Amino acid sequence: MSRSLKKGPFVDEHLMKKVEAQADQEKKSVIKTWSRRSTIFPSFIGYTIAVYDGRKHVPVYIQEDMVGHKLGEFVPTRTFHGHGNDDKKTGVR
């Protein structure tokens, strides 16, 4: 279920402050955040935000088509190593 339209999109205040502070500077550095729940705003376009996946911060370059989505959608938290191999083929007959 999506968020109610009357509430509007959510973004953590500390993340918004970091993005606004970057807008004043000439050099764009990576913005580190733990806020996977924040919605991507149009003002985030062109910035690189390092989103925490539970182990490390994964850099995500924000593009125009990402606006409206959550930051956590672009950084998977689980590593899939594949299903178990079938040892019947390699066994001795």
UniProtKB/Swiss-Prot annotation:
The keyword Cell inner membrane does not apply. It comes from the Bacteria. One of its GO terms (biological process) is ribosomal small subunit assembly. Keywords: Ribonucleoprotein, Ribosomal protein, RNA-binding, rRNA-binding. One of its GO terms (molecular function) is structural constituent of ribosome. Coiled coil: none annotated. One of its GO terms (cellular component) is cytoplasm. Pfam families: Ribosomal_S19. PANTHER family: RIBOSOMAL PROTEIN S19P FAMILY MEMBER, SMALL RIBOSOMAL SUBUNIT PROTEIN US19M. Belongs to the universal ribosomal protein uS19 family. Protein S19 forms a complex with S13 that binds strongly to the 16S ribosomal RNA. This is Small ribosomal subunit protein uS19. It comes from Ligilactobacillus salivarius (strain UCC118) (Lactobacillus salivarius). The lineage of its organism: Bacteria, Bacillati, Bacillota, Bacilli, Lactobacillales. The gene is rpsS.
